[in-house]
UniProtKB/Swiss-Prot annotation:
Modification after translation, per record: Covalently linked to beta-1,3-glucan of the inner cell wall layer via an alkali-sensitive ester linkage between the gamma-carboxyl group of glutamic acids, arising from specific glutamines within the PIR1/2/3 repeats, and hydroxyl groups of glucoses of beta-1,3-glucan chains. O-glycosylated. Extensively O-mannosylated.
Protein's cellular compartments: Secreted, Cell wall
Signal peptide: 1-18
UniProt superkingdom: Eukaryota
Keyword Glycoprotein: yes
Name listed for the protein in its UniProt record: Cell wall mannoprotein PIR1
Matches recorded under Pfam families: PIR, PIR1-like_C
Major site of localization recorded for this protein: secreted
Site (described: Cleavage): R63, A64
Domain notes from UniProt: The PIR1/2/3 repeats are required for the covalent linkage to the cell wall. Their number varies among different strains of S.cerevisiae.
Organism from which the protein derives: Saccharomyces cerevisiae (strain YJM789)
Keywords for the protein's UniProt record, in alphabetical order: Cell wall, Cell wall biogenesis/degradation, Cleavage on pair of basic residues, Glycoprotein, Repeat, Secreted, Signal
MF terms in GO: structural constituent of cell wall
GO biological process terms, semicolon-separated: fungal-type cell wall organization
Length: 341
């Protein structure tokens, strides 16, 4: 019995030593492989739009909507076919709604990103993702993706319309987006999460205060005249889509393989495999905090993979780098230039 207890204790110690702690150097948290031809430095600020992989081929001529971020940094998006821009909320998380036409994603205070999930996710116009406060990224399930915004926690959310709406970010950094087919821009809420609606038309994604990213997923995205291509520091510019920048739109910078949002938070894959913005430094237990690139096709990649998964959580999606459940769909996170309209 004493021997068994010693083995268990040793295993626990080994696990704790392997986990990332905020005091450790986070810039070394990189995947072992890199994307062939990927660009690790991009001189311009850009957004992202959630594009369902199943509809990518048919939406090559369209622009996805930007993702917004909410305050928490999460990224979210609605589920509309038209992809809406993703916004970011305050916590930095990224989320998206489930509309077929993705609605624009905005960011709420926790940083999460949300967007609608509409089916019509148009790559040509791609709506910007916004960020909420928490930094998380989320999206609605509309076929036309709606724009993703960011709320206060940084989560990112966006609608899931097919026309990709811009993703916004809410305060927590999560990213969210609606699920409309037309992809809406993704916004970010305050927590940094990213969210998006599920509309098919992709709407631009926005960001709320928590860092989450949110965006609608409208499938049909509107086409914006493109200005002179943004300069890059290595390779050929792969970013061919653009969207109008608005308040709350998830704005990102890529330098040396490190991805940051407009609040300077670090884009990372956290312990539960979710994509969101935190810190610096990234949250304890983070798996990757570096190794980001833009692929020759114009998609965001971590290591050698450019496939992410939007997984339904209530009325929005969270973004992950792995398939974690039955309600998850494979998506690309299309990089889009943000322009003043």
């Amino acid at each position: 019995m004493q021997y068994k207890k010693s083995l268990v204790a040793s295993a626990l110690v080994a696990t704790s030593l392997a986990a990332y702690a905020p005091k450790d150097p986070w810039s070394t948290l990189t995947p072992s492989a890199t994307y062939k031809g990927g660009i690790t430095d991009y001189s311009s600020t850009f957004g992202i739009a959630v594009e369902p992989i199943a509809t990518t081929a048919s939406s090559k001529a369209k622009r996805a909507a930007a993702i917004s971020q909410i305050g928490d940094g999460q990224i979210q998006a609605t589920t509309k076919t038209t992809a809406a821009a993703v916004s970011q909320i305050g916590d930095g998380q990224i989320q998206a709604t489930t509309k077929t036409k993705a609605a624009a994603v905005s960011q709420i205070g926790d940083g999460q990103i949300q967007a609608t999930t509409k089916t019509t996710s148009a790559k040509t116009t791609a709506a910007a993702v916004s960020q909420i406060g928490d930094g998380q990224i989320q999206a609605t399930t509309k076929t036309k993706a709606a724009a993703v915004s960011q709320i206060g926690d940084g989560q990112i959310q966006a609608t899931t319309k097919t026309t990709a709406a811009a993703v916004s970010q809410i305060g927590d950094g999560q990213i969210q987006a609606t699920t409309k087919t037309t992809a809406a821009a993704v916004s970010q809420i305050g927590d940094g999460q990213i969210q998006a609606t599920t509309n098919t038309t992709v709407a631009p994604v926005s960001q709320i205060t928590d860092g989450q990213i949110q965006a609608t997923t409208l499938t049909s995205a509107t086409i914006i005249p493109s200005p002179a291509p943004a300069p890059i520091t290595n390779g050929t510019d792969p970013v061919t889509a653009e969207t109008c920048k608005s308040s709350g739109t998830l704005e990102m910078n890529l330098k040396g393989g490190i991805l940051t949002d407009g609040k300077g938070r670090i884009g990372s894959i956290v312990a539960n495999r979710q994509f969101q913005f935190d810190g610096p430094p990234p949250q304890a237990g983070a798996i990757y905090a570096a190794g980001w690139s833009i692929t020759p096709e114009g998609n965001l990649a971590i290591g050698d993979q450019d496939t992410f998964y939007q997984c339904l959580s209530g009325n929005f999606y969270n973004l992950y780098d792995e398939h974690i459940g039955t309600q998850c769909n494979a998506v690309h996170l299309q990089a889009i230039d943000l322009v003043n309209c």
